[in-house]
From Swiss-Prot:
It comes from Molpadia arenicola (Sea cucumber). Heme b binds at H74, H105. InterPro entries: Globin, Globin-like_sf, Globin/Proto, Mb-like_M. The keyword DNA repair does not apply. Belongs to the globin family. Residues 12-158 form the Globin domain. Caudina arenicola coelomocytes contain four hemoglobin chains labeled A, B, C, D. This is Globin D, coelomic. The lineage of its organism: Eukaryota, Metazoa, Echinodermata, Eleutherozoa, Echinozoa. Keywords: Acetylation, Heme, Iron, Metal-binding, Oxygen transport, Transport. Gene3D superfamilies: Globins (1.10.490.10). The modification N-acetylglycine is found at G2. Homodimer. GO terms for molecular function: heme binding; metal ion binding; oxygen binding; oxygen carrier activity.
Length: 159
């Protein structure tokens, strides 16, 4: 996978799928810190060892995490990055942005198992936030998008 390969050529997202990703992301970002905090709380619940990768949040309960300044700061950073990735879906820069993310995650020993869990809980959190708006089309668009991104991250991780 070349560094200049575009998101479209990597995954063949349709214009309708891209529109669904962008519109649902806009909905999710109306509660950005709460939504992203929920994703990480779900990760920590499913894999308590993951919480130790965040020393400033280690040992905090879910209730404490929801009000933690560190969690809010992390949620803002993650939501800003994800917004950038979504904004850059159609550009040649996305693989480079993901390569930077991979380098950061490599330093923290984040790998396929962690990406798999993130994808699982991301879908759970999107479904919980969107409720009846979480249609099969929304599910499929997010699943396809995450599979594409995960593929790039794992490929960059291995190289």
């Amino acid at each position: 996978m070349g560094a200049t390969q575009s998101f479209q050529s990597v995954g063949d997202l349709t214009p309708a799928e891209k529109d669904l990703i962008r519109s649902t992301w806009d909905q999710l970002m109306t509660h950005r810190t709460g939504f992203v905090a929920d994703v990480f709380i779900r990760i920590f619940h499913n894999d308590p060892t993951a919480q130790r990768k965040f020393p400033q949040m280690a040992g905090l309960s879910p209730a404490e995490l929801r009000t933690s300044r560190q969690m809010h700061a992390h949620a803002i950073r993650v939501s800003a990055l994800m917004t950038t990735y979504i904004d850059e879906m159609d550009t040649e820069v996305l693989p480079e942005l993901l390569a930077t993310l991979t380098r950061t995650h490599d330093k923290n020993h984040v790998g396929k198992k962690n990406y798999d869990l993130f994808g699982k809980v991301l879908m759970e959190a999107i479904k919980a936030e969107l409720g009846v708006g979480f249609t099969k089309q929304v599910h499929d668009a997010w699943a396809k998008t995450f599979a594409i991104v995960q593929g790039v991250l794992i490929t960059k991780h291995a190289s």
